[in-house]
């Protein structure tokens, strides 16, 4: 599930993209937008991430790395995503049904369900767009129910159905959808209408459900089983995109580094070989999850403590740290992954500022693995391949 703070958004135009695809291939573009009224809250972001993984608390993920490589494709779709607030969440427009209704959905590699507000919902937010199954000629009943709850007490539940899902021009037929009949206020008061999970199908709420990515592959809508993720920074105007079936080589510099994925827990788990600051190592290897649905960079407590010590950051006792507000006195946080190095630059080390007090973009959670959320991902382009499985990472272009 994608966990974010509540905020509204302002639409932002997206730019044309150079996608790695054959000339006849399609592009699906999902633009990002920013919210000028958003006020970040690092403590709440940590709480949400802890709640997200509470039901998997005993799990951890790890993997070995492999050699460098790149991916091409003959058919692809590009979905622009909206950057809400201070890079707190990213969502894209997805069309569901016939005639289609446009829904704003969180794109989340840390979960695998496709669910959204519906006209059957008794407590969904008044500002949410609600899918009406009675108005779609391609809707079919399923008969099953779904329910999901998180460690912070939030939950959502409803019924399953089938309908056509248009993902940036790629029409998925008979996609299982989860229609919310009830949802917690943390969802109903948010800027999005639901969630599109991009994790592995082993962690869908209802067993045996195929994810949208599964169906893009099985229905032959994409020939290359990958999706490329670019998350723009609010400081640079926001923006971003998901490309299904390919990636955008103009968005990163250098070569893609290929890293093996451990998907035994349903996530994109990788091994981080180490972390350093100013050339000094601050951590040995540890496991991490690449999660577009988490805002911050959440580290195991021992790793976070070492990183904080190097920055003279003070522990607030709630998973967050106060850090020096002067970025000129900070150095990038560098991770070695698959034999290559990837940075979290100094401008991303500060997430929240209130006067002379700054809260860091990194923190610690309740798990023995790290969650590499948007603080890392907005600085590094990632190509996800669920079939191998593997990811490919490169620094974003300046």
Swiss-Prot record:
Residue positions of the active site: 108, 291
Domain Peptidase A1: 90-394
Keyword presence, ATP-binding: no
Biological process, per Gene Ontology: proteolysis
Source organism, top-level taxon: Eukaryota
Region feature Disordered, mapped onto this chain: 58-83
Alphabetized Gene3D superfamilies for the sequence: Acid Proteases
Keywords assigned: Aspartyl protease, Disulfide bond, Hydrolase, Protease, Signal, Zymogen
Name the record gives this protein: Rhizopuspepsin-4
């Amino acid at each position: 599930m994608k966990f974010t703070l509540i905020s509204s958004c302002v639409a932002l135009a997206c730019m044309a993209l150079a996608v790695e695809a054959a000339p006849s291939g399609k592009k699906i573009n999902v633009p990002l937008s920013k919210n000028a009224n958003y006020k970040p809250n690092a403590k709440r972001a940590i709480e949400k991430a802890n709640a997200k993984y509470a039901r998997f608390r005993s799990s951890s993920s790890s993997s070995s790395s492999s050699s460098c490589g790149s991916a091409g494709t003959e058919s692809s779709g590009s979905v622009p995503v909206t950057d809400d607030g201070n890079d707190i969440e990213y969502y894209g427009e997805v069309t569901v049904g016939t005639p289609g209704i446009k829904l704003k959905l969180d794109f989340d590699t840390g979960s695998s369900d496709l669910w959204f507000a519906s006209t059957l919902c008794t407590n969904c937010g008044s500002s949410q767009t609600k899918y009406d199954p009675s108005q779609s000629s391609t809707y079919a009943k399923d008969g099953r129910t779904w329910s999901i709850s998180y460690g912070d007490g939030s939950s959502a539940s409803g019924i399953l159905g089938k309908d056509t899902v248009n993902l940036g021009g790629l029409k998925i037929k008979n996609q299982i959808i989860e229609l919310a009949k009830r949802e917690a206020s943390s969802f109903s008061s948010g800027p999005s209408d639901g969630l599109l999970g991009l994790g592995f199908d082993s962690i869908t709420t209802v067993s045996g459900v195929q994810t949208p990515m599964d169906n893009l592959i099985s229905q032959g809508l994409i020939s290359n089983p990958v999706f490329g993720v670019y998350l723009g920074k609010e400081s640079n105007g926001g923006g971003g995109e998901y490309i299904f079936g390919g990636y955008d080589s103009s968005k990163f510099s250098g070569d893609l580094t290929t890293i093996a994925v451990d998907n035994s827990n349903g996530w994109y788990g990788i091994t981080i070989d180490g972390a350093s600051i100013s050339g000094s190592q601050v951590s040995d290897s540890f496991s991490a999850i690449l999660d577009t649905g988490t805002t911050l960079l959440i580290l195991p407590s021992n790793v976070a403590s070492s990183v904080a010590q190097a920055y003279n950051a003070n522990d607030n006792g709630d998973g967050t740290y106060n850090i020096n507000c002067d970025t000129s006195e900070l150095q990038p946080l560098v991770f070695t992954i698959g034999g290559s190095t990837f940075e979290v630059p100094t401008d991303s080390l500060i997430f929240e500022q209130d006067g002379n007090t700054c809260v860091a973009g990194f923190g610690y959670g309740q798990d023995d693995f790290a969650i590499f959320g948007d603080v890392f991902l907005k600085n590094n382009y990632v190509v996800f391949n669920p079939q191998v499985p593997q990811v490919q990472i490169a620094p974003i272009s300046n």
